[in-house]
Design a protein with these regions (language model features):
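Acidic/histidine-rich, surface-exposed loop or edge segments in extracytoplasmic proteins
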Residues: 51-58, 119-138, 219-233, 246-249, ...
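Amphipathic alpha-helical segments
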Residues: 62-81, 146-164
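N-terminal low-complexity, Pro/Thr/Ser-rich intrinsically disordered segments
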Residues: 35-70, 228-232
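A well-ordered secondary-structure block
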Residues: 119-200, 291-323
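Short, well-ordered surface patches within globular domains
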Residues: 88-90, 233-298
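Ser/Thr-rich, Proline-interspersed low-complexity disordered segments
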Residues: 2-50
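Intrinsically disordered, low-complexity
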Residues: 31-32, 36-44, 188-263
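Second-shell loop/turn segments in exported
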Residues: 56-62, 137-145, 227-237, 251-261, ...
């Protein structure tokens, strides 16, 4: 008999399972954060303290309304002298009283600062200016006037004429400046300014000097003699100032300078006192004697003589300009 053979059963082979690749987890990357950069802060500069003022300038020096005495002396040096002025609490710092090369300058000082200035000089210019209060440096300038300006240019620039209550030689019937006047006037933000020409100079009546004073000073106190005080010391100072201003103008015009003479001074004082005590104003004395006779009475030999007199002017500046 045939033996029965069981068929060989192929073993069931499970297919090899390819292991699924393990997913590599992408690392969590935090987005790059741009660092917050604070804008560079420019430090705020401390504003510069400034002063708007009226400035008088020469080739190498200047002075302005509101300037401290310390700054004034640093630039100009010590004054030749300090005069008491008739305006209340005002002192005049006198520079170059006898100089033929430097500008003649009277700086009015009150409360340790400059409140006025007067000059007769070549080559000056006045400005509306802005000054640094910290270092005294000029920041900005706008020209107001300069020496040598013609009469017509003053009119064109809008300067007007002051009245006779300020300068005796002027004609009060004129409300506006015109060619040939002797003074021009302008009010700035902080000062009253007067510029002077000479009607008799034979030329174009150009500007030879100026006077400015702070707006804090009233015109009454600076111009009217009824608001002023007079002592012997103030009167003696005024005499010297009149002498210096007269020579400053003569120097400006290229003329020989005057010299003081004691006997002539005595004759002039006596006549002034006589006019004041007896309430008159004229060259001849009440007894009829003339100026020349007064010189002779003092022992002065002369070949020619002249005299200027002035009444009603408050200070030396008004006296000289009034002539």
């Amino acid at each position: 008999p045939t033996a029965m053979v069981k068929p060989t059963v192929a073993p069931t082979i499970k297919p090899s399972e390819t292991p699924l690749p393990t997913e590599t987890a992408a690392p969590t990357v935090k987005p790059t954060t741009k660092p917050t950069v604070k804008p560079t802060t420019v430090p705020t500069a401390t504003p510069v303290a400034t002063m708007k003022t009226t400035q008088l300038s020469f080739a190498k020096k200047s002075v302005y309304i509101g300037e401290s005495i310390t700054a004034l002396k640093a630039e100009w040096g010590e004054p030749e002298r300090i005069d008491p002025l008739p305006q209340k609490s005002l002192y005049g710092y006198i520079y170059n009283g006898n100089s033929q090369t430097e500008p003649y300058l009277i700086v009015g000082v009150k409360g340790e600062k400059v409140v006025s200035y007067f000059t007769i000089a070549k080559n000056f210019t006045a400005y509306d200016a802005v000054i640094s209060a910290d270092d005294n440096e000029t920041i900005q300038q706008t020209k107001l006037i300069q020496q040598g300006a013609s009469a017509q240019s003053m009119i064109d620039a809008g300067w007007t004429e002051p009245g006779t209550y300020e300068f005796d030689a002027l004609d009060s019937s004129k409300s506006e400046a015109r060619v040939g006047t002797e003074a021009y006037y302008k009010l700035t933000d902080n000062a009253y300014i007067y510029a002077f020409s000479d009607y008799f100079d034979g030329g174009d009546k150009s500007i030879y000097g100026m006077y400015a004073f702070s707006g804090e000073c009233t015109k009454y106190s600076m111009m009217y003699r009824t608001y002023m005080t007079f002592t012997d010391e103030i009167l003696r100072a005024a005499e010297q100032e009149v002498y210096e201003m007269t020579n400053a103008y003569r120097n400006y015009m290229g003329k020989a300078l005057f010299k003081l003479e004691d006997r002539t001074t005595t004759a002039a004082r006596k006549h002034s006192e006589d006019m004041a005590n007896n309430n008159y104003f004229q060259h001849n004395s009440l007894d009829g004697s003339k100026f020349s006779a007064r010189l002779t009475a003092e022992g002065i030999s002369w070949s020619g003589a002249g005299e200027n007199i002035c009444a009603g002017a408050g200070d030396a500046i008004n006296m000289v300009i009034g002539w």
